[in-house]
Amino acid sequence: IIVPQLLNPDGSLQYSVRRYITIGKLIAREFTHGKDSSNNKEVSEYLCKDIDYNQTQEIDWAIGASFFMKREVYAELGGFDTDYFLYMEDEDMCLRSLKIGRPVIYYPKSKMIHNHLRASSKFGKKMFIHAHSMMTFFRKHGLSPQR
């Protein structure tokens, strides 16, 4: 799986690369109200603020705004897991890919504009869908997912 560098509509870098969610990172993310600008250590680690976003590198996963993969890799993975209606399907796909020896590569020479809205950070139906998808993810991969 290849993922491009994502930019905000104003051209600034979007923190689109992630480390796997854990209960600790989830709690920290909730306490910071999903703000990517937070200086919270757990949130910064989850958002991979410590990596060089100009360097091609293997990563855990990236938000699913744009994935590139060969058709045979998609088939080998069985496509997207239909247990996820919305949210977490990108993290699940990348983890399954890594588990079968197919790396996820962040490729910053390819750039895309992404208007990231974080609709699930507001209390409402999408937040409940996101919570349900997280429970599905933890049930399938454990509370501290590993490659």
Locate the predicted segments by residue.
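Generic structural signal for helix capping and beta-alpha/helix-loop junctions
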Residues: 9, 23, 114-115
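Residues that scaffold the ATP/ADP-binding catalytic core of kinase and kinase-like folds
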Residues: 16, 26, 30, 76-77, ...
